[in-house]
């Protein structure tokens, strides 16, 4: 989702995926994505659709994918946009998590330098709770070493990519031994 010129979808097909669908609202980017797929001799379905609407449609119809990749454009370019970016990242990740088959993979990205990795992980934790799933994060990465960042400008560490398995939430994961339970009267 937010496929832009198709990099993730095309790479998935080249790596052996059975199918890939790229979703974006940018018609020019989708045209380029189609050309990129042709140049790489892979078949990818590209759709000019609002990502939020598409994910809502999927979950409404009970449709899920083995892998969902969320790579939106920068959502917070200035301090005034941070609160809205938190809500948007929360919404898109909740929907994305609901669209992943149990045990499937979610790759979610943020290129907003004003959203720290810690904040992004907090957003994902909240989104997982709202989606009724548990995330098992197995990799967190960012820009490669050709994108150095300064200690006095942490926003330069703008790219965050979180790879996680998505599992349905069951109370079993959070059962504590009886002597460790916390109650209102404790």
How would you label these PLM feature ranges?
Residues 2-6, 111:
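Class I SAM-dependent methyltransferase "Motif I" SAM/SAH-binding loop
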Residues 28-69:
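S-adenosyl-L-methionine
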Residues 91, 105-186:
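C-terminal catalytic and target-recognition region of SAM-dependent MTase-like enzymes
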Residues 100-102:
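Helix-to-beta-strand junctions that scaffold the AdoMet/dcAdoMet cofactor pocket
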Residues 19-24:
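Conserved SAM-binding motif I beta-strand of class I
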Residues 29, 48, 65-95:
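Mobile active-site "lid"/loop adjacent to the S-adenosyl-L-methionine
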Residues 5-18:
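Conserved SAM-binding loop of SAM-dependent methyltransferases across substrates and taxa
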Residues 18, 41-44, 133:
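A short helix-to-beta-strand connector/capping loop
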């Amino acid at each position: 989702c937010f496929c832009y010129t198709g990099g993730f979808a095309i790479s998935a097909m080249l790596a052996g995926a059975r199918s890939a669908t790229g979703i974006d609202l940018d018609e020019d980017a989708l045209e380029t994505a189609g050309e990129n797929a042709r140049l790489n001799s892979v078949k990818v379905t590209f759709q000019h659709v609002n990502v939020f609407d598409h994910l809502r449609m999927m979950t409404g119809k009970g449709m899920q994918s083995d892998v969902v990749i969320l790579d939106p454009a920068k959502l917070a370019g200035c301090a005034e946009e941070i609160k809205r970016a938190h809500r948007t990242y929360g919404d898109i990740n909740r929907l994305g998590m609901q669209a992943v088959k149990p045990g499937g993979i979610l790759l979610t990205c943020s290129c907003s330098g004003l959203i720290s990795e810690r904040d992004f992980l907090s957003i994902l934790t909240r989104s997982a709770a709202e989606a009724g799933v548990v995330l098992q994060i197995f990799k967190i990465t960012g820009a490669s070493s050709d994108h150095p960042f300064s200690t006095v400008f942490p926003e330069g560490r703008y790219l965050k990519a979180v790879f996680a398995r998505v599992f349905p939430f069951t109370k079993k994961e959070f059962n504590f031994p009886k002597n460790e339970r916390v109650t209102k009267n404790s």
